[in-house]
Design a protein with these regions (language model features):
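Conserved beta-sheet core of the metallophosphoesterase superfamily
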Residues: 209-302, 307-308
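Core catalytic region of metal-dependent phosphoesterases/phosphodiesterases
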Residues: 55, 82, 87-193
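Polar, enzyme-active/binding microenvironments
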Residues: 73, 81, 105, 299-316
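Short, amphipathic alpha-helical "recognition" segments used to contact nucleic acids or chromatin
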Residues: 2-20
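Mobile, glycine- and charge-enriched loop segments
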Residues: 60-93
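Short acidic low-complexity segments
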Residues: 191-206
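Short Lys/Arg-enriched helix C-cap and helix-to-coil transition segments
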Residues: 44-66
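Short, basic interhelical loop/turn and adjoining N-cap
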Residues: 22-41
Protein backbone atom coordinates (compact mmCIF):
# COMPACT_ATOMS: atom_id res chain seq x y z
CA UNK A 1 0.00 0.00 0.00
CA UNK A 2 1.41 3.40 -0.95
CA UNK A 3 2.10 5.75 1.92
CA UNK A 4 -0.26 8.66 2.28
CA UNK A 5 1.41 12.05 2.39
CA UNK A 6 0.33 14.55 5.03
CA UNK A 7 1.69 17.82 6.31
CA UNK A 8 2.92 18.33 9.86
CA UNK A 9 -0.27 20.22 10.65
CA UNK A 10 -2.41 17.37 9.34
CA UNK A 11 -0.38 14.85 11.34
CA UNK A 12 -0.84 16.90 14.53
CA UNK A 13 -4.60 17.07 13.96
CA UNK A 14 -4.86 13.33 13.29
CA UNK A 15 -2.66 12.49 16.28
CA UNK A 16 -4.70 14.60 18.69
CA UNK A 17 -7.85 12.91 17.42
CA UNK A 18 -6.62 9.33 17.89
CA UNK A 19 -3.69 9.60 20.38
CA UNK A 20 -2.52 6.16 19.24
CA UNK A 21 0.43 5.31 16.94
CA UNK A 22 -1.45 2.29 15.57
CA UNK A 23 -4.57 4.27 14.69
CA UNK A 24 -2.62 7.23 13.32
CA UNK A 25 -0.46 4.90 11.25
CA UNK A 26 -3.53 3.33 9.66
CA UNK A 27 -5.00 6.76 8.95
CA UNK A 28 -1.92 8.03 7.11
CA UNK A 29 -0.57 4.76 5.74
CA UNK A 30 2.58 4.39 7.85
CA UNK A 31 3.85 1.56 10.01
CA UNK A 32 3.64 2.06 13.76
CA UNK A 33 7.41 2.44 13.96
CA UNK A 34 7.53 5.11 11.24
CA UNK A 35 4.55 6.87 12.77
CA UNK A 36 6.42 7.15 16.08
CA UNK A 37 9.50 8.45 14.26
CA UNK A 38 7.38 11.07 12.50
CA UNK A 39 5.83 12.02 15.83
CA UNK A 40 9.24 12.57 17.45
CA UNK A 41 10.41 14.66 14.50
CA UNK A 42 7.32 16.87 14.66
CA UNK A 43 7.62 17.26 18.44
CA UNK A 44 11.24 18.40 18.06
CA UNK A 45 10.49 20.68 15.11
CA UNK A 46 7.46 22.40 16.61
CA UNK A 47 8.42 22.24 20.29
CA UNK A 48 5.21 20.47 21.27
CA UNK A 49 4.23 17.23 23.01
CA UNK A 50 1.90 14.80 21.26
CA UNK A 51 0.53 12.70 24.11
CA UNK A 52 -0.57 9.11 23.62
CA UNK A 53 -3.27 7.20 25.44
CA UNK A 54 -2.05 5.09 28.33
CA UNK A 55 -2.46 1.32 27.89
CA UNK A 56 -5.58 1.30 30.07
CA UNK A 57 -7.22 3.86 27.82
CA UNK A 58 -6.83 6.78 30.22
CA UNK A 59 -5.44 9.83 28.44
CA UNK A 60 -2.41 11.65 29.75
CA UNK A 61 -2.91 15.11 31.19
CA UNK A 62 -3.49 17.74 28.53
CA UNK A 63 -3.28 21.40 29.40
CA UNK A 64 -3.98 23.98 26.67
CA UNK A 65 -0.86 25.83 25.56
CA UNK A 66 -2.06 29.16 26.96
CA UNK A 67 -2.33 27.61 30.44
CA UNK A 68 1.04 25.88 30.44
CA UNK A 69 3.09 28.73 31.92
CA UNK A 70 2.29 32.25 33.04
CA UNK A 71 5.22 34.67 32.81
CA UNK A 72 5.15 37.49 35.33
CA UNK A 73 7.37 40.51 35.87
CA UNK A 74 7.40 42.19 39.27
CA UNK A 75 9.90 44.89 40.28
CA UNK A 76 8.91 45.64 43.85
CA UNK A 77 6.24 43.87 45.84
CA UNK A 78 5.10 40.72 47.56
CA UNK A 79 3.62 37.45 46.37
CA UNK A 80 1.75 35.26 48.87
CA UNK A 81 1.89 31.56 48.04
CA UNK A 82 -0.31 29.09 49.88
CA UNK A 83 -0.99 25.56 48.74
CA UNK A 84 -2.66 22.23 49.39
CA UNK A 85 -5.76 23.74 50.96
CA UNK A 86 -7.76 20.52 50.52
CA UNK A 87 -10.72 22.67 51.55
CA UNK A 88 -12.98 20.74 53.92
CA UNK A 89 -16.63 21.83 54.31
CA UNK A 90 -16.52 20.77 57.97
CA UNK A 91 -13.91 23.28 59.14
CA UNK A 92 -12.17 26.57 58.25
CA UNK A 93 -8.53 26.08 59.19
CA UNK A 94 -6.21 28.38 61.11
CA UNK A 95 -3.95 28.59 58.05
CA UNK A 96 -6.77 29.80 55.82
CA UNK A 97 -7.92 32.40 58.34
CA UNK A 98 -4.34 33.59 58.75
CA UNK A 99 -3.74 33.69 55.01
CA UNK A 100 -6.76 35.96 54.57
CA UNK A 101 -5.42 38.29 57.29
CA UNK A 102 -2.02 38.40 55.57
CA UNK A 103 -3.64 39.39 52.29
CA UNK A 104 -5.14 42.36 54.14
CA UNK A 105 -1.93 43.14 56.05
CA UNK A 106 0.77 42.69 53.41
CA UNK A 107 -1.28 43.88 50.42
CA UNK A 108 0.46 41.56 47.94
CA UNK A 109 0.72 42.21 44.22
CA UNK A 110 -0.18 38.57 43.53
CA UNK A 111 -1.89 35.79 45.49
CA UNK A 112 -1.11 32.25 44.33
CA UNK A 113 -2.70 29.03 45.54
CA UNK A 114 -0.11 26.46 44.55
CA UNK A 115 -2.29 23.46 43.72
CA UNK A 116 -4.68 21.07 45.44
CA UNK A 117 -7.25 23.60 46.55
CA UNK A 118 -9.64 20.63 46.40
CA UNK A 119 -9.40 17.14 47.84
CA UNK A 120 -12.11 15.32 45.85
CA UNK A 121 -11.74 12.11 47.85
CA UNK A 122 -15.17 10.95 46.66
CA UNK A 123 -13.92 10.72 43.06
CA UNK A 124 -10.45 9.45 43.87
CA UNK A 125 -9.11 6.19 42.46
CA UNK A 126 -8.29 5.26 46.07
CA UNK A 127 -10.91 3.21 47.87
CA UNK A 128 -12.98 4.66 50.67
CA UNK A 129 -11.56 3.79 54.09
CA UNK A 130 -14.19 1.87 56.03
CA UNK A 131 -17.34 3.98 56.38
CA UNK A 132 -15.49 7.26 56.35
CA UNK A 133 -17.73 10.21 55.56
CA UNK A 134 -16.48 12.12 52.56
CA UNK A 135 -17.93 15.38 51.23
CA UNK A 136 -19.67 15.29 47.89
CA UNK A 137 -18.21 17.06 44.88
CA UNK A 138 -20.87 19.75 45.19
CA UNK A 139 -20.07 20.30 48.86
CA UNK A 140 -16.38 20.70 48.02
CA UNK A 141 -17.07 23.12 45.17
CA UNK A 142 -19.34 25.21 47.40
CA UNK A 143 -16.63 25.30 50.08
CA UNK A 144 -13.95 26.27 47.56
CA UNK A 145 -16.05 29.14 46.25
CA UNK A 146 -16.71 30.39 49.78
CA UNK A 147 -13.08 30.21 50.89
CA UNK A 148 -11.75 31.81 47.70
CA UNK A 149 -14.40 34.45 48.23
CA UNK A 150 -12.79 35.25 51.60
CA UNK A 151 -9.58 36.12 49.75
CA UNK A 152 -11.32 37.98 46.95
CA UNK A 153 -13.06 40.29 49.42
CA UNK A 154 -9.84 41.53 51.04
CA UNK A 155 -7.35 41.61 48.15
CA UNK A 156 -5.96 45.06 47.35
CA UNK A 157 -6.87 46.77 44.10
CA UNK A 158 -4.99 45.29 41.16
CA UNK A 159 -3.93 42.14 43.01
CA UNK A 160 -3.81 39.16 40.64
CA UNK A 161 -5.39 35.88 41.75
CA UNK A 162 -3.75 32.75 40.36
CA UNK A 163 -3.90 28.99 40.91
CA UNK A 164 -1.48 26.30 39.80
CA UNK A 165 -3.04 22.98 38.88
CA UNK A 166 -2.60 20.25 41.48
CA UNK A 167 -3.06 16.51 41.15
CA UNK A 168 -6.18 16.55 43.35
CA UNK A 169 -7.69 19.38 41.30
CA UNK A 170 -7.28 17.29 38.15
CA UNK A 171 -9.64 14.66 39.52
CA UNK A 172 -12.63 16.84 38.67
CA UNK A 173 -12.29 17.30 34.91
CA UNK A 174 -10.28 14.08 34.63
CA UNK A 175 -13.25 11.95 35.65
CA UNK A 176 -15.71 13.93 33.56
CA UNK A 177 -13.56 13.93 30.43
CA UNK A 178 -13.22 10.16 30.52
CA UNK A 179 -16.82 9.29 31.39
CA UNK A 180 -18.55 11.99 29.35
CA UNK A 181 -16.15 13.17 26.61
CA UNK A 182 -19.11 14.41 24.56
CA UNK A 183 -19.56 17.27 27.05
CA UNK A 184 -16.14 18.81 26.42
CA UNK A 185 -16.25 22.59 26.36
CA UNK A 186 -19.55 22.92 28.21
CA UNK A 187 -19.36 25.41 31.07
CA UNK A 188 -19.06 23.76 34.45
CA UNK A 189 -17.17 20.67 33.31
CA UNK A 190 -13.81 22.23 34.20
CA UNK A 191 -12.94 23.18 37.76
CA UNK A 192 -11.77 26.60 36.57
CA UNK A 193 -15.36 27.36 35.56
CA UNK A 194 -16.23 27.42 39.26
CA UNK A 195 -13.54 29.98 40.19
CA UNK A 196 -14.17 32.83 37.71
CA UNK A 197 -11.97 35.39 39.47
CA UNK A 198 -8.89 33.14 39.42
CA UNK A 199 -6.63 32.20 36.51
CA UNK A 200 -5.34 28.61 36.39
CA UNK A 201 -1.90 27.63 35.11
CA UNK A 202 0.37 24.62 35.11
CA UNK A 203 3.28 26.81 36.24
CA UNK A 204 4.11 30.45 36.95
CA UNK A 205 7.53 31.95 36.18
CA UNK A 206 8.38 35.20 37.95
CA UNK A 207 11.09 37.46 36.49
CA UNK A 208 12.56 34.42 34.73
CA UNK A 209 14.25 33.59 38.05
CA UNK A 210 11.55 31.97 40.20
CA UNK A 211 9.36 29.06 39.14
CA UNK A 212 6.13 28.36 41.02
CA UNK A 213 4.28 25.09 40.38
CA UNK A 214 2.53 22.40 42.37
CA UNK A 215 5.17 19.68 42.33
CA UNK A 216 8.32 18.26 40.82
CA UNK A 217 10.72 16.12 42.86
CA UNK A 218 9.60 14.01 45.80
CA UNK A 219 11.26 12.94 49.03
CA UNK A 220 13.02 14.65 51.88
CA UNK A 221 15.43 16.47 49.54
CA UNK A 222 12.74 17.60 47.09
CA UNK A 223 13.21 21.37 47.37
CA UNK A 224 17.00 20.98 47.23
CA UNK A 225 16.71 18.94 44.05
CA UNK A 226 14.16 21.35 42.58
CA UNK A 227 16.38 24.40 42.83
CA UNK A 228 19.73 22.76 42.07
CA UNK A 229 18.44 20.95 38.97
CA UNK A 230 16.34 23.80 37.60
CA UNK A 231 18.99 26.48 38.02
CA UNK A 232 16.38 28.86 39.44
CA UNK A 233 14.46 29.47 42.63
CA UNK A 234 11.68 26.89 42.78
CA UNK A 235 8.47 27.05 44.83
CA UNK A 236 6.32 23.92 45.20
CA UNK A 237 3.56 22.45 47.32
CA UNK A 238 2.36 18.84 47.29
CA UNK A 239 4.60 17.51 50.09
CA UNK A 240 3.08 19.68 52.88
CA UNK A 241 6.55 20.18 54.41
CA UNK A 242 6.77 24.01 54.69
CA UNK A 243 10.50 24.68 54.49
CA UNK A 244 13.18 26.62 52.64
CA UNK A 245 16.49 25.30 51.30
CA UNK A 246 18.88 27.92 49.89
CA UNK A 247 21.57 27.04 47.35
CA UNK A 248 24.54 29.25 46.49
CA UNK A 249 26.96 28.83 43.60
CA UNK A 250 28.82 31.04 41.09
CA UNK A 251 25.51 32.45 39.85
CA UNK A 252 24.42 33.62 43.31
CA UNK A 253 21.83 32.37 45.78
CA UNK A 254 18.54 30.77 44.87
CA UNK A 255 15.90 29.08 46.99
CA UNK A 256 13.92 25.87 47.07
CA UNK A 257 10.64 26.50 48.88
CA UNK A 258 7.97 24.06 50.06
CA UNK A 259 4.77 25.99 50.75
CA UNK A 260 3.38 23.44 53.20
CA UNK A 261 -0.37 22.99 53.50
CA UNK A 262 -3.26 25.29 54.33
CA UNK A 263 -5.24 22.33 55.65
CA UNK A 264 -5.21 21.06 59.22
CA UNK A 265 -2.92 18.05 59.23
CA UNK A 266 -5.30 16.28 61.62
CA UNK A 267 -8.29 16.69 59.30
CA UNK A 268 -10.34 13.64 58.37
CA UNK A 269 -9.24 13.66 54.72
CA UNK A 270 -5.78 12.60 55.89
CA UNK A 271 -6.96 9.51 57.77
CA UNK A 272 -5.08 7.41 55.21
CA UNK A 273 -1.92 8.23 57.20
CA UNK A 274 -3.28 5.85 59.89
CA UNK A 275 -2.24 8.29 62.63
CA UNK A 276 1.44 7.86 61.76
CA UNK A 277 3.77 10.83 62.28
CA UNK A 278 4.05 12.93 59.13
CA UNK A 279 6.66 15.56 58.33
CA UNK A 280 3.99 18.13 57.53
CA UNK A 281 3.50 21.72 58.65
CA UNK A 282 0.62 24.09 58.01
CA UNK A 283 1.37 27.58 56.75
CA UNK A 284 2.38 29.45 53.61
CA UNK A 285 5.26 31.35 51.99
CA UNK A 286 5.90 35.05 51.45
CA UNK A 287 8.03 36.05 48.45
CA UNK A 288 9.35 39.61 48.44
CA UNK A 289 10.93 41.18 45.36
CA UNK A 290 13.07 44.32 45.48
CA UNK A 291 14.32 45.79 42.20
CA UNK A 292 13.24 42.57 40.53
CA UNK A 293 15.33 40.34 42.80
CA UNK A 294 13.86 37.71 45.09
CA UNK A 295 14.78 38.37 48.71
CA UNK A 296 15.17 35.47 51.17
CA UNK A 297 11.68 33.91 51.28
CA UNK A 298 9.74 33.88 54.55
CA UNK A 299 7.34 31.39 56.08
CA UNK A 300 4.27 31.86 58.24
CA UNK A 301 3.69 28.68 60.25
CA UNK A 302 0.71 27.46 62.23
CA UNK A 303 2.07 26.45 65.64
CA UNK A 304 -1.22 25.69 67.39
CA UNK A 305 -4.26 24.80 65.29
CA UNK A 306 -6.71 24.63 68.18
CA UNK A 307 -5.73 28.03 69.58
CA UNK A 308 -5.39 29.66 66.15
CA UNK A 309 -1.73 30.64 66.64
CA UNK A 310 0.64 31.50 63.78
CA UNK A 311 4.34 32.34 64.06
CA UNK A 312 5.75 35.06 61.78
CA UNK A 313 8.76 37.40 62.09
CA UNK A 314 9.33 36.70 65.78
CA UNK A 315 5.72 37.08 66.84
CA UNK A 316 2.81 34.82 67.70
CA UNK A 317 -0.32 35.96 65.90
CA UNK A 318 -3.81 34.78 66.85
CA UNK A 319 -6.50 34.47 64.18
Amino acid sequence: MAKKVCTDEEFITIWREHQSPDKVGKAIGLSTRNTLKRRRTIEDTHGIVLDALKPNGMPKIYIPDEQMQANITIDNGTILVGSDCHYNPEYVTTAHRGFVEFVKYLKPKIVILNGDIADFASISKHHRIGWQKRPTVKEELDEIQERLGDIEKVRPAGCKLMITIGNHDLRYSGLLSNLTPQYEGIKGFDIADHTPHWKWYWSIMVNQTCMIKHRWHNGIHAVYNNTIKSGTSFVTGHLHSLKITPWTDYTGTRYGVDTGTMACIKDSQFSYTENNPVNWRAGWAILTFINGKLMPPELAEVVNEDEGLIYFRGQLLKV
